[in-house]
Swiss-Prot record:
Catalytic activity: a nucleoside 2',3'-cyclic phosphate + H2O = a nucleoside 2'-phosphate + H(+)
EC number: 3.1.4.37
Gene that this polypeptide is encoded by: CPD1
Principal EC category: hydrolase
Name under which the protein is recorded: 2',3'-cyclic-nucleotide 3'-phosphodiesterase
GO biological process: cyclic nucleotide metabolic process
Keyword Metal-binding annotated: no
Taxonomic superkingdom: Eukaryota
GO molecular function, one term: 2',3'-cyclic-nucleotide 3'-phosphodiesterase activity
Pfam family, one: CPDase
Family listed: Belongs to the 2H phosphoesterase superfamily. CPD1 family.
Amino acid sequence: MGISLWLCPYGHSPEYETFKTLIESLQTLFPNSPVFEPHVTVCSGLSCENMEEVHKVLEMAHHAINAVKSKVDSENALVEFDGFNIGKKYFEKCRLECKPNPMLYSLAKLIRSMFVGELNIDTWLFEEFHPHLSLAYSDIYPMDQAMIRLIRQRIEDLFDVTTEEIESHSRDQDAYKLQHTLKGWSFPLTFKVVRCEGPVEEWEVLSEVTVHG
């Protein structure tokens, strides 16, 4: 993954603490699963050779999100979730899926085009970009039905929502729909540029910026 841009709830906000609690709760179900902070990856594989370029990424993200701030309100959050997946792969083990949002897609497209140099940017955006909030990383597979029920129960209890299994678009994942959209977060929010290399415990936040409402 190299260097990535994360979109995070503001530290110690109610939203941050809620998602952090869920991540820590699910971690107890997966032996040796690392703890990490709540985040949605906007773009990975960024070309950042020095701190000046890291700061350029944050500056661009800051300006871009400020430009759409007027479109964000209590009825139109920047980050929302409408489903969750349980997968085979380590980094796809359990995650909340973001509800499609033009503002988030525009941000990802901008950062990808400027700091990755993607030639087929629209193909990447609509075929490979799947914004989500990871809840657990693990090599455990397969998972028995009792464990899956427990994961669903913890999500349902925390957010007071019911879940329904639906047909998945991937053989490697089981997909579930949430009865109603879960509000994630808007402002304040924090962008972080993170070096995602080696074990998760060794990932390093290179720099960050908080954007207030």
